A protein has these predicted regions:
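Short glycine-rich anion-binding loops that position phosphate/pyrophosphate groups of nucleotides
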Residues: 3-9, 38-40, 68, 110-114, ...
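Short, acidic/small-residue loops that bind anionic groups at enzyme active sites
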Residues: 12-39, 54, 63, 208-224
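A structural motif corresponding to the C-terminal end of an alpha-helix
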Residues: 28-29, 139-145, 159, 220-233
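Short, glycine-/small-residue-rich phosphate/pyrophosphate-handling segment
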Residues: 20, 29-67, 75-90, 231-250
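Flexible nucleotide-interacting loop at or near the entrance of a catalytic core
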Residues: 87-103
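Glycine-rich phosphate/diphosphate-binding loop of Rossmann-like nucleotide-binding domains
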Residues: 49, 53-54, 99-167
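Glycine/threonine-rich flexible loop motifs
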Residues: 6-17, 42-45, 116-123, 194-206, ...
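A glycine- and small/hydrophobic-rich beta-loop-beta segment
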Residues: 151, 159-223, 227
């Protein structure tokens, strides 16, 4: 039901069926999703909140309203949620088999940033789209998903525990501290193999001569996970290649 008024929520919470909508909802046994939208003070009213909690108790899924300018001219929580978010709720409820229910899946995505100084860093062209798509599909199929992501322009999928990282070291710590409890780990991030050996505390000034940076290896997260993989755990790694892709993939 989108939008669901305070009146409709109250009727449904107490089993009233005096029109087609409430009568249908009282009789149906399919997944039921409600998107409350109303004035902020109506939404925050303890009676409305009690009704929403009661609906959740009876198996309704409640989509939290957004915050912003309301139809009445006020500004606050109670705004109709983004249609894309509502669609994700619907897809999650009815569109995909829940063959991954009960599974914990960790996905990495996006690039890493290796600082040169407070202003500059080394990175790559990864968009994160592959990892985000994998995390979203795992979520839609019922998995408990953790997404460890570098800086991207993408919005993390809903219902996913998102962990933001910057460097390869950050990613190593974020992944290895969570790896033991995961059933599946998918490494789709584009992780730097090297980082500056020394990070300047101040911006490196330009000069007439060339600039050389000493680089050192970063932690190999995938190798660590492979060496510490527990029985039954599935580990999947991605590698970006520009030539001999099949041969390198087999390696």
């Amino acid at each position: 039901i989108a939008p669901a008024t305070a009146n409709v929520c109250a009727k449904l919470a107490h089993g009233l069926a005096d029109d087609m909508l409430t009568t249908t909802l009282l009789a149906c046994q399919c997944p039921r999703i409600i998107a409350p939208a109303m004035n902020t003070r109506m939404y925050e009213n303890p009676i409305t909140q009690d009704n929403l909690r009661l609906l959740e108790h009876y198996g309704f899924t409640i989509i939290e309203p957004a915050s912003g300018l309301l139809a009445c001219g006020d500004s606050g929580k109670g705004k109709f949620p983004d249609e894309g978010l509502i669609l994700e709720y619907i897809l999650r409820a009815i569109a995909y088999p829940k063959d991954l229910a009960g599974k914990k899946i960790l996905v990495t995505a996006g690039p890493t940033q290796e600082a040169v100084d407070p202003v500059r860093y080394l990175t790559n062209h990864s968009t994160g789209k592959m990892g985000y798509a994998l995390a979203r599909m795992a979520m839609l199929r019922g998995a408990d998903v953790t997404l460890v992501t570098g800086e991207t322009s993408l919005t993390p999928p809903p219902f996913v525990n998102t962990v933001h990282i910057k460097s390869a070291h950050d990613l190593f710590e974020a992944v290895t501290s969570r790896s033991e409890e995961q059933d599946i780990i998918i490494k789709a991030a584009a992780v730097a193999d090297y980082r500056p050996a020394v990070v300047s505390d101040e911006k490196v000034k330009k000069s007439d001569g060339d600039l050389s940076l000493a680089l050192e290896r970063t932690e190999d997260t995938l190798s660590y996970l492979g060496a510490h993989k527990r029985p039954g755990q599935l580990l999947c790694g991605f590698a970006m290649e520009t030539e001999h892709m099949v041969e390198h993939a087999k390696e």
